Structure formats: C-alpha cells, structure tokens
Amino acid sequence: SDAVANGVHAISGVVDS
C-alpha cells in the first residue's frame, strides 16, 4: 500500500504485513 506500515513506507500494490 501507500500507507506507512510498521514504520516502513510500503510500496503501493504490496500487501502491508
């Protein structure tokens, strides 16, 4: 996603764990 997950900026389209 484009949202910050686990303090790491995830790439859009990738599922945030």
UniProtKB/Swiss-Prot annotation:
Main location: secreted
Keywords for this protein: Secreted
Gene Ontology terms: cellular component: extracellular region
Superkingdom field: Eukaryota
Tissue and organ distribution: Expressed in skin glands.
Purpose: May act as an antimicrobial peptide.
Protein name according to UniProt: Septenin 1b
Upper classification of the organism: Eukaryota, Metazoa, Chordata, Craniata, Vertebrata
